Amino acid sequence: MTEKKYIVALDQGTTSSRAVVMDHDANIISVSQREFEQIYPKPGWVEHDPMEIWATQSSTLVEVLAKADISSDQIAAIGITNQRETTIVWEKETGKPIYNAIVWQCRRTAEICEHLKRDGLEDYIRSNTGLVLDPYFSGTKVKWILDHVEGSHERARRGELLFGTVDTWLIWKMTQGRVHVTDYTNASRTMLFNIHTLDWDDKMLEVLDIPREMLPEVRRSSEVYGQTNIGGKGGTRIPISGIAGDQQAALFGQLCVKEGMAKNTYGTGCFMLMNTGEKAVKSENGLLTTIACGPTGEVNYALEGAVFMAGASIQWLRDEMKLINDAYDSEYFATKVQNTNGVYVVPAFTGLGAPYWDPYARGAIFGLTRGVNANHIIRATLESIAYQTRDVLEAMQADSGIRLHALRVDGGAVANNFLMQFQSDILGTRVERPEVREVTALGAAYLAGLAVGFWQNLDELQEKAVIEREFRPGIETTERNYRYAGWKKAVKRAMAWEEHDE
């Protein structure tokens, strides 16, 4: 009998490194997770130690195989998914980082972005990289490291230094420095990559003074990049054959591989991505244009919108307002009332993200009357997550001209049946919740497995995409539009709160 084979997904996130073993039926066999230190040298600055990222990720790989009691020769392939935009520069000769990893959340390069704005580069960046000019992305982070570590510009030009996002760093370490690659999804988050020519953008490299010599080769999201012999019993060299940034991996894990398919991840905030097929749609409505994975890991495009406050607004109810003891309680209290009694909560605690991009908006509660109680406010806070999702979806439909027929959902808050039903009601579309909630790891596993023939094609995977529950709209169009109009009015009044009158 042939020995049973498995796929390992490495999921390198912002606060922890995880490894997940899956079998051919996409069942999760074992999981290992290790947290690592968040470094805050100054307000608004966020760093990670690249060696700690590597140590935690490599140890979870060993642990996850031991937990499942399988040897490395039973692993058909490894797939990698990662926190996007986080930037690492290291020495080619020694493999030592020349500075800590600058994390996607870090705002230290705001001044560099202001200079680029003054130089009139905003439109060029949006048109060619698909991104908005913001410290979020890798390009200005690389420049900052080269500007602040003595001698590094010259060393980079001599080919002595290498740059990579987290996927690139992990593969470099796993292959003992033999392979320096990234995939199209991660490259598209650097602000250095032209999403139309599918090559590094010479103008952006020149503007930021980043030598091409230090950049990784950009490859498809599903192919064999190299092999590793790290991890567990047995000495087999395991192919590394899938890479995707975390949100694109979730999109693929949800099998949103056709034009017009979309997923929303409900975490601290919300990330919604819609696959736009072979067409890069330039957003006129505050969204990002990014690269996603097609059916065999080839380049597709997507529109992406980020909402800042989703699960975080439930935490606010619990930690600051003390209205609930546990996030799970929110559903119970929300369903104790029939509606919000006219109340709208706009959770703009740190401003508003897509599609408004208003850093001066602030949180507000509107429509308070004498009959309003705590349950109404809890319900209105949950509803705000669904309203913000509709805001992003309306922008996506306006940009793409595509009408969404079903939204696939994942993340912690999807366990809340009230929220999922209201999401369906307010969108006027089906909401599909999958049985397997580990969709980010699943996406990386699928990409890796397809590359080595572990799964033959996407049709085989469609059978495994079991929808645990489907939510369908339960309110009339007039009621839906009336409620949404109230939300829009509330948002308008919360905007520009911090701005002072001239």
From Swiss-Prot:
Activity modulation notes: Activity of this regulatory enzyme is affected by several metabolites. Allosterically and non-competitively inhibited by fructose 1,6-bisphosphate (FBP) and unphosphorylated phosphocarrier protein EIIA-Glc (III-Glc), an integral component of the bacterial phosphotransferase (PTS) system.
Entry annotated with the keyword Acetylation: no
Binding site for ADP: 14, 18, 268, 311, 412, 416
Keywords recorded for this protein, A-Z: Allosteric enzyme, ATP-binding, Glycerol metabolism, Kinase, Metal-binding, Nucleotide-binding, Transferase, Zinc
Disulfide bonds: none
Sites where the protein binds sn-glycerol 3-phosphate: 14, 84-85, 136, 246
Binding positions (ATP): 14-16, 268, 311, 315, 412
Pathway named in the protein's UniProt entry: Polyol metabolism; glycerol degradation via glycerol kinase pathway; sn-glycerol 3-phosphate from glycerol: step 1/1
EC numbers on record: 2.7.1.30
GO cellular component, one term: cytosol
Keyword Kinase in record: yes
Molecular function as annotated in GO: ATP binding; glycerol kinase activity; metal ion binding
CDD domains (alphabetical): FGGY_EcGK_like
Domain of life: Bacteria
Binding site for glycerol: 84-85, 136, 246-247
InterPro entries for this protein: ATPase_NBD (IPR043129), Carb_kinase_FGGY (IPR000577), Carb_kinase_FGGY_CS (IPR018483), FGGY_C (IPR018485), FGGY_N (IPR018484), Glycerol_kin (IPR005999)
Catalytic activity: glycerol + ATP = sn-glycerol 3-phosphate + ADP + H(+)
GO biological process: glycerol catabolic process; glycerol metabolic process; glycerol-3-phosphate metabolic process
Family affiliation: Belongs to the FGGY kinase family.
Function: Key enzyme in the regulation of glycerol uptake and metabolism. Catalyzes the phosphorylation of glycerol to yield sn-glycerol 3-phosphate.
Cited HAMAP family: Glycerol_kin
Known partners and oligomeric status: Homotetramer and homodimer (in equilibrium). Heterodimer with EIIA-Glc. Binds 1 zinc ion per glycerol kinase EIIA-Glc dimer. The zinc ion is important for dimerization.
Record's protein name: Glycerol kinase
Organism for this UniProt entry: Shigella flexneri
Organism phylogeny: Bacteria, Pseudomonadati, Pseudomonadota, Gammaproteobacteria, Enterobacterales
Gene behind the chain: glpK
